[in-house]
Amino acid sequence: MKQETTSTNQITEGVIWKQLLLFFFPIVMGTFFQQLYNTADTVIVGRFVGKEALASVGGSTAQIVNLIVGFFVGLASGATVIISQFYGAQDKRNVDRSLHTAFAFSIVGSVFITILGIAIAPWLLKIMNTPENLLTDSVLYMRIYFAGILFVFIYNVGSSILRAVGDSKRPLYYLIVCCILNIVLDLILILVFHMGVAGAAIATVVSQAVSAILVTRALMKSDDLLHLELKEIRFYKAALLSLIWIGLPTGIQSTMYNASNMFIQASLNTFGTDTMAAWTAFGKIDALYWMVNSAFGIAVTTFVGQNYGAGKYDRMKKCVRIGISMALIASLIFTIIFFLGGRSLFHLFTDDTAVIDIGMQMLHLIAPSYFLFVFIELLSGALRGTGDVIIPMIMTCGGICLLRVLWIIFIVPLKPGLETIIFSYPVTWFITAVLFIIYYIWKSRKL
């Protein structure tokens, strides 16, 4: 049964470029604080504990966490898409069922991932060629992190659902609070109590717990179409099937993407601690660009989902064109900034000259190709907003993941070295971007 509202939905009715920016800025600020939230551990550990600890909380550890968390968040994104569509159609009953199913999925999934992550952490780190001197701290960090994975899942799902219905401000406010808390706890646990890597992990888990509580409370207090009742959290068959149908390909795509990064990480680990530390620091700097590109992707997915649900296909296509234009400008700005100020950014993490030189080499190889990923991120987001997830998954898994692994296996041995490994990124981005452009043009002509 559909429910009418008296207020105007600006996503389906307002001036597109203006509403896209109004929606985008809270997301990008939220993503910025999410990165600051994650980077605080890295900066404080790198500056006050040492490069070995820096490599322990980044490198292989970060890749494994991204792999497992990325699969679940990708899977749960199915709820975000269907809630966005039902919300655009003002279908309260299905919005409600999708919301409670998503929370049930988060709880059950977190229990499974906690047990699995704690159990296989040492094995995963060993198969990634993690140096022996980093193994103990890396295992400790991973196990503490996975013990609190419930909070990661709840926050990510809850905040994504809020954004799906057009609320990008409250997730930002909650992240600001929790980011500040994380930094304060890092400083106390690492500098005062000298807890090292364990202190960084505990600070992260406690902060994530606060963010999960805040986003859950927001959904419980909402009196809009979207309202969470703890006693109603359960699996609804139709909602669960829709969540899996849309979310599973996205989860597989995320897993394959992170698995290919793990494959590259394993290759980089053979170069030693300096390269691992440089890759960890580069990852945090690189994330400054990805947070903006990802925010545009989230905005476009939400706008496409709601306009698709409302049957406004021309407006939906215009949202995509405007979003891509904005994201391309942003990619150019970041490339220039990184080339001019990259060395200063690396100094935030370490003063080790060898580590910084290696990091700058990585940055110079990857940053000029940022514009290519705009097409992958935004076009896959647009297609996902319409419920089309299978073909984008195949293109991403084949164009990025499979080709990247094949590059490491067949191309790197022909010219061994760091540059050859890193060059796999722009090559696979180019191929995948071309595939997405062709498919999107064909698909949009059918609407």
What residue ranges belong to the model's regions?
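Residue-level signal for short hydrophobic patches within transmembrane helices
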Residues: 13, 17-36, 40, 64-71, ...
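Small-residue hotspots at the loop-to-helix junctions and early N-terminal turns
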Residues: 49-63, 138, 142, 201, ...
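Small-residue-rich hydrophobic transmembrane alpha-helices
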Residues: 54-115, 152-171, 278-342, 373-396
